[in-house]
Regions:
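Short, surface-exposed patches at the edges or C-terminal ends of soluble domains, predominantly
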Residues: 1-420
């Protein structure tokens, strides 16, 4: 679609993993109205809401957030934000943060100071929304490739445990081991003899949506990498599990050694009976400040102890938002695309839904999740009907010929009898 100045691509065909041709047509028609409306909306949208992208505490670099932020910029104002200034002017840092409607925290790797936590806490108390994408275990495939396929998975302390506990959830220092997994590609051999092969990777769960909320409705599989388990706690805040591991999964404790060579005996289904572990949770309501009954590290002008009605989402995998980077062509790839297996996952759609919901843009969410039921032909009935017509086409002419022959014989005999 073009308005003369810019062109927007409209995706007409939705090719989901593991779907039949009939299901692909159903999904494509179901999303057609939204895709067309969304493209037209981009020509007329007037940005109002603002998203702060945390740029301190070792969060993901821009190159790995590129595709998601490119999409988000079409609807919202996007700006980097750092908490480094808390040490020199916490009051100003808080005021600057409160200019934003949403704070995105994508895979921090260094601990938060108590002062930084208080600023975020007061931002939430004043109605700010947060999308937490957090890793509680330090491990990556890149490290494994560099060390011959073996590495140690170590707990990662971000100094956020007490804060999360007060808000109603706990991120565990575990790795989700799931028999419903995605594959990774490893190289075998040296030099020109190198071969690439797909291997099962139980620490990359392929998560199917339970379709229990606007955020996760009509999604294809979402791929996570080294995800951690989430516990929800009773504190009066409404909680909705958006993503969870399969029934055939378990939580492996850390520290532990991770090896690319997975023993098939260790993948016995009998060992995977404690599944359905929460991996992404929506929390809504009035949150209690983590400093309600504690000594505050900062003396701010406002120190609210109970938040306005607000909401946040926590995902136990910082890599859910990370797009791959093509080093050969020096360009970021589309979020959710696995260049090694050429498969697409719905990470971007899930995060876009989460962002829309946190910012109260539910109209597009409703349209995106609109269900259209197509009346497909019943293949068995069609086959039976075809056979019936084939029989009729064969028998009717034959029957007509027999009738004509009988009538001809009858009239011929009658004519001869009259002559006699």
């Amino acid at each position: 679609i073009s308005d003369g100045k810019r062109v927007e691509k409209v995706r007409l065909f939705i090719d989901k993993l593991g779907t039949t041709d009939q299901e692909r047509v159903q999904n494509s028609v179901q999303r057609l109205e939204y895709n067309l409306t969304d493209a037209l909306h981009k020509f007329t949208v007037k940005k109002q809401k603002k998203i702060a992208i945390l740029r301190s505490n070792g969060t993901l670099e821009d190159v790995y957030l590129y595709d998601f932020l490119k999409t988000a910029r079409e609807y919202y104002f996007i700006a980097p934000f750092t908490l480094d200034s808390v040490a020199t002017n916490a009051e100003k840092t808080l005021k600057d943060l409160e200019k934003f409607d949403l704070l995105l925290v994508a895979k921090p790797t260094s601990p938060f100071s108590d002062e930084q936590k208080q600023v975020i806490d007061q931002y939430i108390m004043n109605g700010g929304r947060v999308l937490w994408l957090i890793d509680q275990v330090n491990v990556s495939l890149e490290d494994m490739y560099k060390t011959g396929g073996v590495t140690m998975a170590m707990p990662l302390d971000l100094n956020l445990t007490d804060m999360f506990f007060q808000y109603g959830f706990r991120l565990n220092y575990t790795l989700i081991n799931d028999l419903y997994f995605s594959e990774i590609v490893v190289a075998t051999g040296d030099g020109s003899q190198s071969r690439y092969m797909n291997i099962p990777w139980v620490y990359n769960p392929m998560v199917l949506s339970s379709n229990n909320h606007l955020i996760n409705s009509n999604l294809d599989a979402v791929r996570l990498q080294f995800a951690n388990g989430i516990d929800t706690l009773k504190n009066g805040v409404k909680k909705t599990v958006l993503l969870s591991s399969s029934p055939f999964s378990k939580a492996d404790g850390t520290p532990r050694e991770i090896n690319l060579r997975i023993d098939p005996k260790a993948m016995n289904k009998e060992l995977y009976k404690k599944g359905n572990i929460p991996l992404a949770v929506l929390l809504e309501g009035e949150f209690k400040s983590m400093y309600k009954d504690r000594v505050r590290p900062l003396e701010l002008k406002e120190n609210a102890t109970l938040s306005r009605p607000t909401k946040m989402i926590v995902v136990s995998d910082g890599d859910i938002i990370k797009n791959d980077f093509d080093s050969q062509h020096k360009m970021p790839l589309e979020l959710g695309f696995d260049r090694w297996t050429s498969k697409y996952y719905d990470n971007k759609a899930f995060l876009q839904n989460a962002m829309n919901y946190l910012l109260d843009d539910t109209e597009f969410l409703t349209l995106r999740n609109k269900k259209v039921q197509l009346a497909f032909l019943d293949k068995e009935k069609v086959a039976e009907s075809v056979r019936a017509w084939q029989i009729k086409v064969f028998l009717y002419p034959l029957l007509a010929l027999v009738i004509v022959m009988l009538l001809s014989g009858y009239f011929y005999r009658r004519k001869n009898i009259k002559k006699v």
